[in-house]
A protein has these predicted regions:
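Non-catalytic DNA-recognition/assembly elements of restriction-modification systems
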Residues: 12-41, 178-189, 196-199
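Generic, well-ordered alpha-helical scaffold segments in large soluble proteins
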Residues: 34-41, 94-97, 129, 142-146, ...
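Sequence-specific dsDNA recognition surfaces
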Residues: 7, 11-17, 32-47, 61-93
C-alpha cells in the first residue's frame, strides 16, 4: 500500500519514509504536528550563579533515561533573564540537543509544573499540544525506543570533537506511529509494569 501526506493543497507520496505497516486504528504523524519543540534559556557564563535563588537551569547532565535529576551543582538565573513560556510544565519531554553519541535519545518527562525551573539552551523542550498524561508517556517511551534513537542518530551533525548536534527542523519531521488513546494507555501501563519488575 502507498502512503501520502497532505502538504498544502497537494498530496506527496511518503511511502519510502514509512518504516512499517500499522494495525487498524493507528496512524503515522510527524512530530511537528503534535508538539512545539524549543530550547531553553541562553545566557552568559557570568550571569549564572549557584545561589539557589531565581530560576534553576537544568542541563544535559540532569537528564537520565526517564528521569529528571535535580543536582546540588545546578545553576540559577535571575527571573528577568528567563522567559515565562520556557518554564517547565507537566508533560513536557526533555532531551539534550547537543550531546555525546551515547546520550542521543536520552529523554525525561516533567511530572508536574515547575514554575521555578527551565533548561539551558542545549536542551530541547518537547511540549505536546494535547495535554494528556498517557499521551505524553507514550511519546516519551516511543522517542526513547531503539527505532527513534536510530532516527535521531541519523539526523545529527558532529559539532566539535565529541559532541553531536540534533537539528530541530529534522527532528520535527520524525514520523511517529500513533495508536488510539485506549491503546496508548495499555502500552504505557505494560511498559511501567516491566519497569517495576526491573527495579
Amino acid at each position: 500500500s502507498k502512503y501520502y501526506e497532505q502538504v498544502g493543497k497537494s498530496d506527496k507520496e511518503i511511502t519510502e519514509e514509512i518504516a512499517f505497516d500499522l494495525p487498524n486504528g493507528w496512524y503515522w504523524c510527524r512530530l511537528k504536528d503534535i508538539c512545539s519543540i524549543f530550547t531553553g534559556a541562553t545566557f552568559k557564563k557570568e550571569e549564572a550563579t549557584i545561589t539557589r535563588k531565581g530560576i534553576r537551569i537544568l542541563r544535559g547532565g540532569n537528564i537520565s533515561p526517564f528521569e529528571l535529576k535535580i543536582k546540588d551543582d545546578d545553576i540559577f538565573l535571575t527571573k528577568d533573564k528567563v522567559k515565562e513560556d520556557i518554564l517547565l510544565k507537566e508533560n513536557d519531554i526533555l532531551t539534550p540537543a547537543v550531546t555525546s553519541l551515547e546520550n542521543i535519545g536520552k529523554m525525561a518527562r516533567v511530572d508536574s509544573d515547575m514554575s521555578d525551573t527551565t533548561v539551558g539552551g542545549f536542551v530541547f523542550i518537547i511540549r505536546l499540544h494535547l495535554i494528556n498524561r498517557w499521551f505524553s508517556k507514550y511519546i516519551l517511551y516511543l522517542l526513547s525506543s531503539p527505532f527513534m534513537i536510530d532516527f535521531m542518530k541519523s539526523i545529527t551533525n558532529k559539532s566539535g570533537q565529541a559532541f553531536y548536534n540534533i537539528g530541530k527542523e529534522r527532528l520535527s519531521m520524525a514520523l511517529l506511529p500513533i495508536p488510539p488513546l485506549t491503546e496508548q494507555y495499555r502500552i504505557v501501563t505494560q511498559i511501567e509494569k516491566l519497569f517495576e519488575q526491573l527495579r
